[in-house]
Amino acid sequence: MAVLRSLLPQLGLFLCLALCFSPALSASYNDPCTVFDTISTTNLRVNITAEGSGENITYTVWVHVNSSVSVVILKAVNQDNKPVGTWVGATQECNDSSVLYRVTPSDNSDFQATWIVPNSEDITKVNLHVLMAIGNGTAAVTSVNLGEPQTSTPLRPTPEISETNQTTTMTTDKTPAMTTAKTPAMTTAKTTAKTTAKTTVKTTAMTTAKTTAKSLAVNALGSPLAGALHILLVFLISKLLF
């Protein structure tokens, strides 16, 4: 009995400490990153953009949220289910290598998170898991494979139009227009030029011939010397005949 009486103060102190630390132990066990009553798989609107070069690439992850979303949980893993990269500005790190961001409720806004990945990492083999807590122990989750082309995760720039396509377009568009525009104009111009030239030459030739003949007749009849020679010629012929 004496031994039990000596141990009572120590047992009381132990029970007191256990009661004090039990809330903390319970909180650490009930990780807010993993405890949800209902988790539904859905297609969330997720956009990812990349920038920077060198040893690290900085990715910006955009998640569309609404007023019912209070928490966004992000996790990036490779094919071996190992975490990839570092998340910047997370509110809390979870036990399963995911990170938790608390979101201020707002209507139709975009949540933004920064993700830094080593340049040596093959990003095409990474899966990005996005989970949104929407209250009452309910969450919506989606997974994005960064190696698959998706409209919601534009990691690669849009390919430019090839030179072959541009050449084909120019040939198709310009050739008919040029042919249609030039052919009637050239035909009309040539026909008009030929007709005008022929008419001008013919008119000029006829006018010149008539003018020359008329001028010769006038000159022959109107000149005094020509009249005198004509009279002399008539006189000589009459003398020879008679």
From Swiss-Prot:
Which tissues does the record link to its expression?
Answer: Present at high level in the dermal sheath cells near the bulge area of the hair follicle and in the differentiated sebocytes of the normal adult skin (at protein level).
Q: Where is the lipid attached (GPI-anchor amidated serine)?
A: 223
Prosegment residue ranges: 224-242
A Gene Ontology biological process noted in the UniProt record is: cell differentiation
Q: How is it modified after translation?
A: N-glycosylated. GPI-anchored.
Q: Disulfide bonds, which pairs?
A: none
The membrane-topology field of this record reads:
Lipid-anchor; GPI-anchor
Q: Where do the record's glycosylation annotations fall on this chain? A: 47, 56, 66
Please report the organism this UniProt entry assigns to the protein: Mesocricetus auratus
What keywords appear on the UniProt entry?
Cell membrane, Differentiation, Glycoprotein, GPI-anchor, Lipoprotein, Membrane, Signal
Q: Could you tell me what this protein does?
A: Modulates leading keratinocyte migration and cellular adhesion to matrix proteins during a wound-healing response and promotes wound repair. May play a role during trichilemmal differentiation of the hair follicle.
Compartments (UniProt record):
Apical cell membrane
Expression induction per the record is:
Following tissue damages of the skin.
Highest rank taxon of the organism: Eukaryota
Any one GO CC term of this protein is:
external side of plasma membrane
**Database matches in PANTHER family:** PLACENTA-EXPRESSED TRANSCRIPT 1 PROTEIN
Q: What is this protein called?
A: Placenta-expressed transcript 1 protein
Q: Which positions make up the signal peptide? A: 1-26
